[in-house]
From Swiss-Prot:
Compositional bias (Basic residues): 7-25
Spans annotated as Disordered: 1-29
Quaternary structure note: Part of the 50S ribosomal subunit.
Organism lineage string: Bacteria, Pseudomonadati, Aquificota, Aquificia, Aquificales
Keywords: Ribonucleoprotein, Ribosomal protein, RNA-binding, rRNA-binding, tRNA-binding
GO biological process: one example: translation
Record GO cellular component, one term: cytosolic large ribosomal subunit
Protein name: Large ribosomal subunit protein uL16
Length: 138
């Protein structure tokens, strides 16, 4: 299983930050016919993204094209278990993608709408945020 992670990061241990507002970019279906859109803000780990991708691919079967529109670029640190507070920030644990409401997470083409709806429904169960199916505006 190849988990997504950046080759290089500008900062090894960045601050957490917070998510404000709605997505102004990556909020329309650009490549496929159907998209999975986030309805609330959140952070997706590379494991969650991979689990959702596998669910989509299994449901869509052959002839389908899947695009992943999110990438986990933010490093997340974690201190070891049973460690007292202080003594600096913890070591790198995993990477997360920051998602705003309206962000398109996955796109799908080459399948009927019912198949896409079921694939995205299963993928949505793997994610910690609410999602919905959107169609291309072409």
């Amino acid at each position: 299983m190849s988990l997504l992670q950046p080759r290089k990061v500008k900062w090894r241990k960045p601050q957490k930050g917070r998510t404000k507002g709605k997505a102004t970019r990556r909020n329309q279906v650009d490549f496929g016919e159907y998209g999975l859109q986030a309805l609330e803000p959140g952070r997706l780990t590379s494991r969650q993204i991979e689990a959702a991708r596998i669910a989509i691919v299994r449901e869509a079967k052959k002839g389908a094209k899947v695009w992943i529109r999110v990438f986990p670029h933010k490093p997340v640190t974690k201190k070891p278990a049973e460690t007292r507070m202080g003594k600096g920030k913890g070591d790198l644990d995993h990477y997360e993608a920051i998602v705003k409401p309206g962000h398109i997470l996955f796109e799908l083409a080459g399948v009927p709408e019912e198949v896409a709806a079921e694939a995205f429904r299963k993928a949505g169960h793997k994610l910690p945020i609410k999602t919905r199916l959107v169609k291309s505006v072409e």
